[in-house]
UniProtKB/Swiss-Prot annotation:
Disruption phenotype: Causes a vacuolar protein sorting defect. This is Putative uncharacterized protein VPS69. Keywords: Membrane, Transmembrane, Transmembrane helix. It is a multi-pass membrane protein. The gene is VPS69. The chain crosses the membrane at residues 10-30, 65-85. Partially overlaps SRP54. Disruption phenotypes caused by deletion of this gene may also be a result of a defect in its overlapping gene. It is found in: Membrane. GO terms for biological process: protein targeting to vacuole. One of its GO terms (cellular component) is membrane. It comes from the Eukaryota.
Length: 106
């Protein structure tokens, strides 16, 4: 059974300053085992990615999740947490670029 709680934990940290900061802590308790694949999980998360205005950063994070999707479904929970951390790290690295900083400042 895969609950993706680790990925939710990382995601909650990412949107800590967004309008979703009130909703996501409750969503984190939802059992996501009913999702048949990581694709459906991605589709579920897609609306929550909207607060990220910089297209490059959002695309980079989505691409990293897409790459990880081939491994998350059959993986054990500790592997899921590693993949989630990798995706979050990649997103943070993208935010460090001047273009992202300029976009956030606007």
């Amino acid at each position: 059974m895969h609950t993706y709680i680790y990925i939710y934990t990382v995601y909650i940290q990412m949107v800590a300053f967004s309008p979703y900061r009130i909703v996501l802590p409750f969503v984190a308790f939802v059992d996501l085992a009913s999702f048949s694949s990581f694709r459906s999980y991605q589709a579920f998360l897609r609306p929550f990615l909207r607060p990220f205005r910089h297209q490059t950063c959002s695309s980079y994070f989505a691409l990293d999740l897409d790459f990880a999707s081939a491994f998350v479904v059959p993986a054990a929970s500790f592997v899921e947490s590693l993949l989630a951390y990798q995706a979050y790290s990649a997103y943070q690295a993208c935010l460090a670029y001047p273009a992202c900083l300029a976009c956030q400042a606007s």
